[in-house]
Each structure stands twice: as C-alpha cells, then as structure tokens.
Amino acid sequence: MKQTMITILGPTASGKTSLAAALASKINNLDAASWGGTTQGAEIISADSRQVYRGMDIGTGKDLEDYTVDGKLIPYHLIDICEPGTKYNLFEYQQDFYDAYLDIRKRGVLPILCGGTGLYIESVLKGYHLSPVPQNQELRDRLADKNLDELTVMLKELKT
C-alpha cells in the first residue's frame, strides 16, 4: 500500500514532535529503492493552532530543537508563520496545509502530519469543505449589544 502521509497526534508534551523528527530522520537516511518506497525523505507539517505564531514558544510545546536529529535539521512547515495577534482560523490552516502538502509530495517527499489540534487534523484527514467568509462589521455591530436570550431568539427565527 502506497503511503501518502503519516499522522502523529496526541496531547501537548506527549513526545509527538520528537517521534515525528526521529521517524523523518530514519526515512531521510533510507534509500527508497532498498525498501521499495516511493519517497525521497520526509518532512513534518505541524497541526498546532498555537505554534503558527512567532514568538509564542513557551507554553505551546514548540520544541524547535527537537527538529534537529543527529545534527541534521528535519524540515518543518506551518510553525512561526503568523504574528501574534493575527487571526488565524481553520480555513486558513487547511489552505496552508494543502499548499505545504502538495509542495512536499511534488518533490517526492513523505509528509508527516504532527500535532494536537484535533480540529486541524480532522479537517485535512476528513477533507472538510470550507469556504472563506468575509467579516461583516455591520452585522457584528448590530449583534454586539444583544444578550444571550435575544441572540437565541434571533437564531431560532433564522432556523424557521
């Protein structure tokens, strides 16, 4: 069976990154022909909603030193791609994931999806179909002063 991606998931600080990096290192040191593989190495794609932010290294489990195995840096993607305070959502993650995934596969490399943000992982593994939705400031302003009961009534009216 041809593998198109390996996924490693789990909670924060459970050793996912070091496992993914060690696995990528092993794959990178193999000759694909020797094991019947079709890939030339491996790279890691992060699936973490907080590691996308630059400078947020403490408390996010962004152990960048884990990406160096036996003195060689394992290439990684979707880490440190946004400034703190920038809104980054599931739609954007999914688009960035597909860009990284397609680039990696195009080069004949095996992607390793690694992280603990379940919704990010599920969105790519199950192929969620998402659409960009522009911000509607007028609607936000109209709803900002409503309490929960008023919002609930409005939602029920929309459903009927």
Model-derived features: positions:
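Phosphate/pyrophosphate-binding catalytic cores of soluble transferases and nucleic-acid-acting enzymes
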Residues: M1-T160
